[in-house]
From Swiss-Prot:
Alphabetical GO biological process terms: L-methionine salvage from methylthioadenosine
Chain intervals for the UniProt region annotation (Enolase-phosphatase E1): 279-518
Pathway this chain belongs to: Amino-acid biosynthesis; L-methionine biosynthesis via salvage pathway; L-methionine from S-methyl-5-thio-alpha-D-ribose 1-phosphate: step 2/6; Amino-acid biosynthesis; L-methionine biosynthesis via salvage pathway; L-methionine from S-methyl-5-thio-alpha-D-ribose 1-phosphate: step 3/6; Amino-acid biosynthesis; L-methionine biosynthesis via salvage pathway; L-methionine from S-methyl-5-thio-alpha-D-ribose 1-phosphate: step 4/6
Keywords, in A-Z order: Amino-acid biosynthesis, Hydrolase, Lyase, Magnesium, Metal-binding, Methionine biosynthesis, Multifunctional enzyme, Zinc
Entry binding sites for Zn(2+): H137, H139, H212
CC cofactor note: Binds 1 zinc ion per subunit.
Binding site residues for substrate 1: C119
EC number, as in UniProt: 4.2.1.109, 3.1.3.77
Species, as recorded: Populus trichocarpa (Western balsam poplar)
Protein name: Probable bifunctional methylthioribulose-1-phosphate dehydratase/enolase-phosphatase E1
GO molecular function: acireductone synthase activity; magnesium ion binding; methylthioribulose 1-phosphate dehydratase activity; zinc ion binding
SMART domains (alphabetical): Aldolase_II
A Pfam family that the UniProt record links to this protein: Hydrolase
UniProt-listed InterPro entries: Aldolase_II/adducin_N (IPR001303), Aldolase_II/adducin_N_sf (IPR036409), Enolase-ppase_E1 (IPR023943), ENOPH1_eukaryotes (IPR027511), HAD-like_sf (IPR036412), HAD_sf (IPR023214), MethylthioRu-1-P_deHdtase_MtnB (IPR017714), MtnB_viridiplantae (IPR027505)
Taxonomic classification: Eukaryota, Viridiplantae, Streptophyta, Embryophyta, Tracheophyta
Amino acid sequence: MAAAPPAVAVNGGGMAAAKVASQAYLESKAVKDTRVLIADLCKQFYTLGWVSGTGGSITIKAHDDSIPKRQQLILMSPSGVQKERMEPEDMYVLATNGSILSSPSPKPYPYKPPKCSDCAPLFLKAYDMRNAGAVIHSHGMESCLVTMINPLSKEFRITHMEMIKGIQGHGYYDELVVPIIENTAYENELTDSLAKAIEAYPKTTAVLVRNHGIYIWGDSWISAKTQAECYHYLFDAAIKLHQIGLDWSTPNHGPIQNVKVKAGMNNSNNRIEPLPRCIVLDIEGTTTPITFVADVLFPYARDNVGRHLSATYDTAETKDDINLLRTQVEDDLAQGVDGAIPIPTDDAGKEEVIAALVANVEAMIKADRKITALKQLQGHIWRTGYENNELEGVVYDDVPEALEKWHALGIKVYIYSSGSRLAQRLIFGKTNYGDLRKYLSGFFDTTVGNKKETRSYIEISESLGVDKPSDILFVTDVFQEAFAAKGAGLDVMISIRPGNAPLPENHGFKTITSFAEI
């Protein structure tokens, strides 16, 4: 083992970091064993094609029960070294802030001078943001190719595969979602994109880099390695399913739908049926994953209520939002709604009013209430998020092509969601596929009526001016909404997407797993 040199910061830090780790810890059995482990894993990963051509890397924390995990030393494989020839003494030892505490000794020609992994800043993000115990960076071919199948996709999705059970927090029936970030010329330039993906996808344990590879982390080296094996298996399965024309992202893994329609729609008997004059789409579970709303939009609104109200308190828009909330809360208090607390008058002062508003809004969001006062405020908060590039709408990969096709056929497409019309426009105005509003003719929200009431769909059909309600096709993932729309005479299909609620047996509705089936 080379003597510990002066601390050199990879990602901030300095001499003070060197004092964190005693010489005894640096020379401990935990550190020595981790050096050996990384060398062994590099050899194994080389045979799997994950770290060929000196690419890829691995980092593991030196576990010591007497030291809190966040303070444990970090060991990393070096950059530009043949991974199958790695030796224990080749590893770098870093403090938690990225300062190098121990470097490998230079080797004679033809070896290059030692250099810490270019992945170090990205590894440190996973350690800091997820309290990881180990991180693997793989250049496995399957992790590269799977990002190329759809070069516009921002996510990899797969469901109903046994190996999903090997991914932390997932089961067989779950939809596994892995974010995809764009590659850059230099590894460290990926740091911000990786951090944003980790923040935006709180359930993920991996981030794909298009045309490059994948970063995978776990609580321990065993967890990271196990998940890495499962991820690579699933990517390989998706590629092979794609090659034989099967869709890996749907529960039944049926044929990939790529229907080209010109004069009508093919039904199950391959007869051409007249096209609908209008299509009305739900959002959650239909155009957009439920997880986007639950894991991204709702938390963003919840976490930014106070900031938004403080910054805009004196504007006419926010005064209107507050008045709506006051009215709603007064009604909630009268009805004994759980979580409702009185909102002081303006005389109590801005901070007192905002504190009460925040408490009520948080309770409403937690209860997933579909009320206008909440939806209107959320829309205004989300607007700021989109304007500041803190939010980006997400739609399923089959949605943009379908919208474009329907638009070309002269079919008018509308949105009907419990979210406000503003929130709807925001989602489709800035998506992972760009601005899709050019394909949409209008937006309906709960001001037209409750989505589970037939009267709402009668109102929509009268607003659209169709000759008969059956000229409208309504697509939703919710049985009660489908039932209400059918009662108004609309043609109805139910969207089956991973994570959607199960349907009653013998529900009697047509179902689709992709817009390509419409």
